Every structure is written in C-alpha cells, then in structure tokens.
Amino acid sequence: QNGPRPIGIPP
C-alpha cells in the first residue's frame, strides 16, 4: 500500500 511520493522523487 503506497502513499503519495514526496516532491522531488521521480515517478
């Protein structure tokens, strides 16, 4: 279960 990635981490 993945939450939102922090800004700066590429998708």
UniProtKB/Swiss-Prot annotation:
This peptide both inhibits the activity of the angiotensin-converting enzyme (ACE) and enhances the action of bradykinin by inhibiting the peptidases that inactivate it. It acts as an indirect hypotensive agent. The modification Pyrrolidone carboxylic acid is found at residue 1. It is found in: Secreted. This is Bradykinin-potentiating peptide 11i. One of its GO terms (cellular component) is extracellular region. GO terms for molecular function: peptidase inhibitor activity; toxin activity. Belongs to the bradykinin-potentiating peptide family. It comes from Bothrops jararaca (Jararaca). It comes from the Eukaryota. GO terms for biological process: regulation of blood pressure. Keywords: Hypotensive agent, Metalloenzyme inhibitor, Metalloprotease inhibitor, Protease inhibitor, Pyrrolidone carboxylic acid, Secreted, Toxin. Expressed by the venom gland.
